């Protein structure tokens, strides 16, 4: 009898949601991983300038059906993060709320989660929080989810392992403070 392993919890930001819809990978990653996010990332993914040629339509029903959980973030969690890391104010609201939520939950090596973001400032802050090893790129998620090679190739550069690896190395070497 096969033992069903629990899905790995992966917290995603707005950009990862939008890129996974653009490339048609959302459902596949949600079937393979327990995808979670915060309300602000959902709000951001559902809005945008529809006249922008780069606009990506995100189907609310499909988005919500794929999520294992969506989390509200309190003002105290956001304020606490910004007070401890003032440069966090420079993050987009979705990434700020996502990192504030995770910090408020006490994420540590004892809690097995992954974080997927393609925002360099969010990666830097994740590093300062001691979470560099929790980061996973969208490319790795989709490759493990059985999508087509065409969907993987369609991912923009900052959703790929090479980009994330380069940023992590620069952070570890102190090139990016």
Predicted regions and their residues:
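Short beta-strand/turn micro-motifs composed of small residues
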Residues: 117-119
């Amino acid at each position: 009898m096969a033992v069903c392993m629990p899905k790995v919890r992966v917290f995603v930001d707005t950009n990862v949601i939008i890129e996974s819809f653009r490339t048609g990978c959302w459902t596949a990653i949600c079937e393979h991983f327990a995808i979670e996010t915060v309300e602000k990332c959902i709000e951001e993914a559902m809005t945008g300038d529809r006249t922008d040629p780069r606009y990506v339509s995100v189907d609310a029903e499909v988005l919500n059906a794929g999520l294992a959980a969506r989390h509200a973030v309190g003002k105290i969690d956001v304020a606490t993060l910004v007070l401890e890391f003032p440069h966090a104010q420079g993050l987009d609201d979705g990434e700020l709320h996502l990192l504030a939520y995770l910090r408020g939950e006490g994420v540590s090596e004892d809690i097995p989660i992954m974080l997927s973001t393609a925002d360099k400032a969010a990666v830097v802050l994740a590093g300062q929080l001691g979470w560099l090893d929790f980061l996973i790129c969208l490319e790795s998620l989709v490759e493990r989810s059985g999508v087509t090679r065409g969907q993987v190739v369609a991912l923009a550069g900052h959703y790929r392992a090479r980009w994330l690896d380069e940023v992590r190395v620069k952070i570890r070497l102190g090139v990016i403070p």
